[in-house]
């Protein structure tokens, strides 16, 4: 491809509304253009990259035994009402009406559509298992679209769905898809981690997320430095560093604590170790009008997913208002504690191992110091309620936990029969009786992968693409292309490289475009390999080669360029 025949839409300046580096570089490199909030047009440069992602995804899905289909992006409300998600999904579901007043939605996901399809196509266990996938545009009406393609409203996604007669069959396919996802992200040249995850609104049992490691990531991912244990922050099990509770060494005493509504104020005023304090958080119970107390250590953060999964706790988690606290307890949020608290109590594992600690007295501006379990109050229900912190023991007993930032680019779920049961997706089993199918679903944010790859691979000059993702593998940059010697050598090499199967961008812009601008554009776009043709180099029988990831250029004999690139570029 010659630049004279291509839409080369690079920009020198960074748009003011682009915050994250992937958004900035995709705009500057001429990959995308904004149409409206959360909506982007893919220009030829960007689309070439996305097609590379799609091709690798298709190859690995096909190899894993998944069959490609294409479902409508507009979905009838009846299916979502049947599954129960029409109201559950919330305002992110864009609801529309046709001219006849019938309700539809712009599909954010396709569990209902695929389940409806399969209940009409499958009749016998002999047709199972089956795994279907599509690559298609989705729409989620994000309240605040931001970060370019990282959190847009319209995006490209690969979603696949599998159907099984039993859990054992589902597990086999789930493991196969897990491996396929690892293959995909490895082939894309990304540093990534699969982590255990919570199923969220999709429902079902087990799930894993796939995160591209990047400091700009929105998610915390947790992994052991001594094993392959990994989970997202919502799912990671918090194991106390302490193994036993120390014996009491202080007497219980009631202390006046004016102007200490926060843990930080209490610690500073009374010179307490923060590890000797607790947070008492009051939340709504499942039973209407009831409240439950959740208690974590003062230096820990409540994990709202874990908390909402506790028996009796309302989901999603709802904190009690100040009026509710005063009505039920008689004190405000800064003075609460478990002693004489007239509510059910759940404490974190770390709290169970505390001794001589400070708690609110359930009286404004008063705390108890020197509190000890069993001596002063019984140990209530104990559960894992907090977020892990770096240095916690790994739940598998091997090593300690580290935390890094990640960008979620894939998610696989074992759905169980959540949708198939609600929508009566059944086949006749081996014994001739109806069997409700077990389902799995598996998603990759194809357009998000492009942005995530840039977040992970960039420098001050622009994008750094892997050979697998680059829009072009080679930038061929002639200096003084208007001269016969340079033009003939450039055209000859261009023909040889393209005939050998390389994707080459020949920068044939005229002399009004300086060499510096040409080099800067190729680095901004992120083309991995650059060949410079100049009359000076040709006079010595050489061309100049430079890798996007290496600082120094090197001279190559003209006759050796093709073999050098064939050995260098991962095909």
Swiss-Prot record:
It is found in: Cytoplasm. GO terms for biological process: prolyl-tRNA aminoacylation. It catalyses: tRNA(Pro) + L-proline + ATP = L-prolyl-tRNA(Pro) + AMP + diphosphate. One of its GO terms (molecular function) is aminoacyl-tRNA deacylase activity. It holds the Pfam family tRNA-synt_2b. Keywords: Aminoacyl-tRNA synthetase, ATP-binding, Cytoplasm, Ligase, Nucleotide-binding, Protein biosynthesis. InterPro entries: aa-tRNA-synt_IIb, aa-tRNA-synth_II, aa-tRNA-synth_II/BPL/LPL, Anticodon-bd, Anticodon-bd_dom_sf, Pro-tRNA-ligase_IIa, Pro-tRNA-synth_IIa_bac-type, Pro-tRNA-Synthase_IIa_type1. Its main location: cytoplasm. One of its GO terms (cellular component) is cytosol. Homodimer. Consists of three domains: the N-terminal catalytic domain, the editing domain and the C-terminal anticodon-binding domain. Belongs to the class-II aminoacyl-tRNA synthetase family. ProS type 1 subfamily. Catalyzes the attachment of proline to tRNA(Pro) in a two-step reaction: proline is first activated by ATP to form Pro-AMP and then transferred to the acceptor end of tRNA(Pro). As ProRS can inadvertently accommodate and process non-cognate amino acids such as alanine and cysteine, to avoid such errors it has two additional distinct editing activities against alanine. One activity is designated as 'pretransfer' editing and involves the tRNA(Pro)-independent hydrolysis of activated Ala-AMP. This is Proline--tRNA ligase. It comes from Pseudomonas fluorescens (strain Pf0-1).
